A protein has these predicted regions:
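Active-site and adjacent substrate-binding regions of carbohydrate-active enzymes
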Residues: 1-361
């Protein structure tokens, strides 16, 4: 059972709970730590493991570490990436992509209390942690062990590819990220070996499998099967299974320690991260294909049955993502609105087709 973020968060701006104010405490609006402990106990009796998100990349700007940093404490200022002028931030901006170019442009936020620039990859109220400071890893590990002691058995480690920063790079998928995940895995294997790490790695297919580590040096126990999810939706819209087949062939060639979570939709958007090298080999223009897919699934293409929403469109790059439930993207919503029973039958068949494909992978 994977519950959405429930740790203490600021209100109202909290990115759906992914801006964490206290990693050790359940948000008072949702309950108490005792409630969480009671829940995990009852779930375990029923043979159910509880999964919670553990946000590794950042804290809320109202976290006690951030508040101490704002108050001038140098110890906690070292927990974040802080700069007195734009010299280094401007160097980062030359190579680091923006996650939310429309709603949260740039990768840095000015903090008036400190008179410093803060690295904020996601939103201005989410301060990126500095894992080059060993104290950050130690304290974050203490928090994940605390939650394990409350009975949480699976941790979805959020935004893990972003956690290491280095000038002159994209600050994505750097080698140090794998070292940190490996260290966390080693701690868990020593202290609570039944606990599982589920990596949220929404990256290009070639980057994905590396987060399993190797049989000798394992990292995540399991990963979301992002590539198959994206390729299934792509095949449905394009009526072309070649990309899907190539991706499945690559998947089956991975070592036995690779354990994927197959899924069609989740709370996140669909990022159209297809394998561009394979697309080009098949004579498919990667950019035009991506544009076709996100326009198709927003319903803005002749013959589209979908009624999703375009998300995070960046006119500079032509990049965008898609939002919508499985039913809406398969055509159920549009068919019901038009009272079209034939279209509804096709929509349900699409839904069943995708679930059948995912179930037997």
């Amino acid at each position: 059972l994977h519950l959405m973020p429930l740790l203490q968060m600021p209100h109202p701006h909290n990115d759906g709970g992914y801006a964490v104010e206290d990693f050790d405490t359940v948000d008072p609006a949702l309950g108490t730590n005792k409630d969480l402990e009671n829940l995990t106990r009852e779930l375990r009796k029923a043979g159910i493991s509880l999964c919670l998100d553990f946000v590794m990349n950042h804290t809320a700007s109202t976290h006690r570490w951030a508040m101490a940093a704002k108050a001038g404490d140098p110890w906690f200022q070292a927990y974040y990436h802080l700069y007195e002028d734009r010299t280094i931030p401007d160097q980062y901006e030359q190579t680091v992509p923006q996650v939310f170019p429309n709603t949260a442009p740039g990768n840095f936020t000015w903090c008036e209390e400190m008179h410093k620039w803060v690295l904020t990859t996601f939103h201005d109220y989410q301060w990126d942690l500095n894992y080059a400071n060993p104290a950050v890893f130690v304290d974050m590990t203490k928090s994940i062990l605390h939650l394990a002691n409350l009975g949480v058995e699976v941790f979805r480690i959020d935004a893990v590819p972003y956690i290491w920063k280095q000038l002159g790079t994209t600050c994505r998928n750097l080698p140090q990220v794998h070292t940190i995940v490996r260290m966390l895995r080693m701690v868990l294997e020593c202290v609570c070996p039944a606990v599982i790490l589920k990596g949220e790695v929404v990256m290009a297919p070639k980057e994905l499998a590396a987060y399993f580590g190797t049989p000798e040096k394992p990292e995540c126990h399991m990963l979301y099967n992002v590539s198959t999810m994206v390729n299934l939706w792509g095949a449905l819209a394009s009526r072309d299974t070649r990309l899907l087949k190539a991706q499945l062939d690559a998947l089956h060639a991975l070592p036995d320690n690779c354990w994927f979570v197959n899924y069609l939709r989740c709370h996140d958007d669909i990022g159209w991260g297809l394998d561009e090298a394979v697309e080009e080999k098949l004579g498919i223009d990667p950019q035009k294909h991506k544009e076709y897919l996100y326009h198709f699934y927003e319903g803005n293409f002749p013959g589209s049955w979908a009624k999703g929403e375009l998300y995070n469109y960046d006119p500079a790059t032509g990049d965008a993502r898609s939002c919508g439930t499985t039913a809406s993207l398969c055509g159920v919503e549009q068919a019901l609105e038009k009272n079209d029973t034939i279209a509804l039958d096709y929509a349900v068949k699409r839904d069943l087709l995708l679930h059948t494909a995912m179930a037997f992978l």
